[in-house]
Each structure stands twice: as C-alpha cells, then as structure tokens.
C-alpha cells in the first residue's frame, strides 16, 4: 500500500454473498483515528461495534489487511457473532478507505451487447477498450463477446505446445489466439460459451487482494445466476463453480495506465469430446481440481438451466443494468480501427502467438 497521508477517509466494501461494510476514519500522524464502522450487517452483542472501532484506532495506516483483521479478531470476545461480514471484510474496507478506492456508484457504466467479431479482434478489442477507459475517453464498460468460428484462446503466459494439440486444432478448424491476460485456455465454438469483458479503473479494486477482486467484480454475475436458479461461487483463485461442477473461469490484466481488464468465459453447451482433442489438459491440473476427467470437470449452463443462451445473456445484461444503472452503447469506428491495427501488428503475428512456444 502506498503511503497514507493525513486526512479524512471513507471506504465501502460489499461482501460477496454478504453485507455492506462502511468505514469512516481520520489519519493522524500516520495512524487511524476517529474510526466509525457501519453497514447493514448483523452483530451481537451491540457493544462489539465499539470494540471493533477501538481495535482499529491507533493502527498504523500502513497496516496490511492481515494485521488489521488480526487486530479486530483479538479484540472481540469469544461469544461475538458477526453475520454477513468478518474481520477480513473490515480489513478490506479499511484498506479501501486508505487507498481512496472508488465504488461502483462512483462511475457511469456502459454495456456493449454481444457483437460478432473474429477472435483476434476480440482479444485486440480488450486491449483497446481498457486503454480507452484509462484515458478517460470511455466510461467503465461491460462487453459481451460473439463469434462464429471455433477458437482456442490461451493465456498470456501459457506454452502453445503444452496447451494445444496442433493436429486436433487443424482437424476441427480451430484458430488459436493468445490474449493479454493470464490464466488458462478457453475452448470456444459458436453458441457454446458466454464470454464477457469488464474494463474498469483500478481504483474500483484498490484495497482488495487479487483473490478478493475476482468475486467482487463478479458479484452481479452471481446475482444473475441466482435469478436463473443457479447457486454459484468462486473457487479460488479464478474458477466459477456450482455443486455440479465448474461452469466458468476468469482472468485479469492490470495495465500500467491505471485501468484493468477482467473477463470471464462460462460454458453453455460445450462439446467436451472435441475440447479434449484440441486442448492438452494436463494430469497435474486435473489432479489439483479433484477430478480424473477433463470432460467431467465442466458442467454447462444449458444442462443446469434448460434455458437458451439468449435468455441467459438477457438476464445477465438486465441484472448489470439494474444493479449499476448501466446504459447500452456500441463500439465506435475509431475503436474498431485501433483493434484492426493491433490485430495486424500484434495479435495475428507469429511473434505474439509463439511468445511462449
């Protein structure tokens, strides 16, 4: 955390699946002062609120989240009950206050509905729109992907030869593309997945660890899935799962310009037999995930909901719009042209796809 200067601070954190935690405090001589915790959580006994405030007062403004949580926990009586939040949630809220983090309500949001593009254009557009948000030329944006041809999108740091079977890819006409974010490979055919990208200022996740930022940025998705009758959660670090199996995975890229990309692919109706012919899913990864078969690891949304892909997309768009007041927009011609240039100079070049052979 960067050095916290003296002055008033306000921080908020909505616990994924839990309650809102708010803190107002002063920083005096590098230490927390006049700390006031509030929120729509439940806490027993009443006196515990004052105990939490007292535990925070006097802490160094450079304290880590772990140190803050430990201070709160050590001050609480054994019979204290925290419902909808935790000492860790308090620590995150304090860190966000000290970092002068922004909240969802501080921004005007835009939604780009599914727009058909080549997969090369999609990964290039991710970089373009993140740069546009960083430059202030575009509001924070949620964009849904649409594509026609089968593709594999590998993570920025994955080995091409270790992740993709070239014979299988050629046999099934699969294009291999490398994205700018880390994480694992995505197998995508027309209509078989739901993919979206979020382009946000990093201030939105200031004070959050990388692990905490994933469920924080996808709380609206969990609400969407709940509306569809699916109880889903994050399985650290970046898998989205239900009690019937994995349904998706997320990846992030934080740009030096101050923006970040967060994107998710969820399986809708995957051809698992074809997937295992194209992707080389290592035994080590399957073992770590507690399963022996790649085909059994993924449980598509179509089977779990019985709904069309369009119905699921409509629910997701509606949920995000209602939750954050987002307005529909499109991709400008200038953004399209910049993406085309990036495809030609970077994303469709042998140097990029083979950057990790």
Segments from the language model and where they lie:
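A generic structural motif
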Residues: 39-43, 200-206, 272, 304-307
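Structured beta-strand/loop patches that form or line metal/cofactor-binding pockets in enzymes
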Residues: 1-31, 234-241, 247-250, 337-357
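Short acidic-glycine loop/turn motifs at beta-strand connectors
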Residues: 26-32, 148, 190, 243-244, ...
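Contiguous, small/hydrophobic- and glycine-enriched helical/loop subdomains that border
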Residues: 193-240
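N-terminal lobe of the biotin/lipoate ligase/transferase fold
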Residues: 96-208
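Active-site- and interface-proximal helix/loop "cap" or "latch" segments in soluble metabolic
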Residues: 17-100, 301
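Long, positively charged amphipathic alpha-helical accessory segments at protein N-termini or as interdomain linkers
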Residues: 1, 62-93, 99, 212-232, ...
């Amino acid at each position: 955390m960067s050095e916290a200067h003296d002055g008033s601070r306000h921080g908020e954190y909505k616990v994924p699946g839990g309650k809102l935690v708010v803190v107002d405090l002063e920083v005096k001589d590098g230490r927390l002062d006049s700390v006031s915790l509030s929120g729509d959580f439940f806490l027993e006994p009443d006196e515990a609120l004052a105990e939490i405030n007292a535990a925070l007062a006097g802490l160094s403004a450079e304290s880590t989240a772990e140190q803050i949580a430990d201070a709160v926990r050590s001050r609480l009586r054994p019979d204290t009950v925290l419902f909808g939040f935790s000492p860790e949630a308090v620590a995150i809220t304090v860190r966000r206050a000290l970092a002068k983090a922004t909240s969802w309500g501080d921004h005007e949001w835009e939604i780009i509905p599914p727009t058909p593009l080549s997969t090369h254009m999609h990964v290039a557009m991710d970089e373009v729109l993140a740069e546009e948000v960083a430059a202030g030329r575009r509001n924070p944006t949620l964009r849904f992907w649409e594509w026609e041809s089968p593709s594999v999108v590998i993570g920025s740091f994955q080995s091409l030869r270790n992740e993709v079977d070239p014979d299988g890819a050629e046999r099934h006409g699969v294009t291999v593309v490398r994205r700018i974010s880390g994480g694992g490979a995505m197998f995508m055919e027309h209509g078989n997945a739901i993919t979206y990208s979020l382009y946000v200022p990093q201030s939105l996740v200031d004070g959050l660890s990388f692990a905490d930022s994933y469920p924080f940025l996808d709380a609206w998705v969990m609400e969407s899935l709940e509306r569809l009758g699916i109880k889903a959660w994050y399985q650290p670090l970046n898998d989205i799962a239900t009690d019937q199996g994995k349904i998706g995975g997320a990846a992030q890229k934080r740009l030096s310009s101050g923006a970040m990309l967060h994107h998710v692919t969820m399986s809708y109706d995957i051809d698992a037999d074809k997937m295992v012919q194209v992707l080389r899913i290592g035994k080590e990864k399957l073992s770590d995930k507690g399963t022996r078969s790649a085909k059994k690891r993924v449980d598509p949304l179509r089977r779990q909901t019985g709904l069309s892909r369009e119905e699921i997309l409509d629910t997701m768009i509606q949920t995000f719009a209602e939750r954050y007041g987002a307005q529909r927009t499109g991709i400008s011609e200038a953004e399209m042209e910049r993406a085309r240039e990036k495809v030609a100079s970077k994303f469709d070049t042998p140097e990029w796809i083979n950057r990790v052979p």
